[in-house]
């Protein structure tokens, strides 16, 4: 048999937990509602992000870069993309990664990234890769 002296504090604790749980879920729902409202009012988010079905129908080349009209070589793209990723990690500025890939890597930012990453000894190798994927 449970004593009433233990029952009182236990019952109080259970009620307190129920109230806290209800308040936490209300905060979560409010936050979710704010995020959904932001996403629904954002014109760029709805226009830029395709639905899942559309994303699956994209060609492999479209995922990487529309401006690359040359030979689709996954290893070359990975190598060139790695330069831009490393350059982004060096500077931590989103525009560095975007500008580095612009024009299928045929730009001054990509060349500057090669220089800043101290890859100038491999410049000819990267230049050939850019020519192959960007023809």
Curated annotation (Swiss-Prot):
Molecular function via GO: neuropeptide hormone activity
Span of the signal peptide: 1-26
Annotated keywords: Amidation, Carbohydrate metabolism, Cleavage on pair of basic residues, Disulfide bond, Glucose metabolism, Hormone, Neuropeptide, Secreted, Signal
One biological process term in Gene Ontology: glucose metabolic process
Organ and tissue specificity: Produced by the medulla terminalis X-organ in the eyestalks and transported to the sinus gland where they are stored and released.
Subcellular location: Secreted
Disulfide bonds: 68-104, 84-100, 87-113
Protein's job: Hormone found in the sinus gland of isopods and decapods which controls the blood sugar level. Has a secretagogue action over the amylase released from the midgut gland. May act as a stress hormone and may be involved in the control of molting and reproduction.
Family indicated by similarity: Belongs to the arthropod CHH/MIH/GIH/VIH hormone family.
Record-given protein name: Crustacean hyperglycemic hormones
Lineage: Eukaryota, Metazoa, Ecdysozoa, Arthropoda, Crustacea
């Amino acid at each position: 048999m449970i004593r009433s002296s233990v029952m009182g504090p236990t019952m109080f604790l259970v009620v307190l937990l129920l109230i806290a749980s209800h308040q936490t879920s209300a905060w979560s729902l409010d936050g979710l509602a704010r995020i959904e409202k932001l996403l629904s009012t954002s014109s760029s988010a709805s226009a830029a992000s395709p639905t899942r079905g559309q994303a699956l129908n994209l060609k492999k080349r479209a995922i990487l870069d529309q401006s690359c009209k040359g030979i689709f070589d996954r290893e070359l793209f990975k190598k060139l993309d790695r330069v831009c990723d490393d350059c982004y990690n060096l500077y931590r500025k989103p525009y560095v990664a975007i500008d580095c890939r612009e024009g299928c890597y045929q730009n001054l930012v990509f060349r500057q990234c090669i220089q800043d990453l101290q890859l100038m000894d491999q410049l000819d190798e990267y230049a050939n890769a850019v020519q192959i994927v960007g023809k």
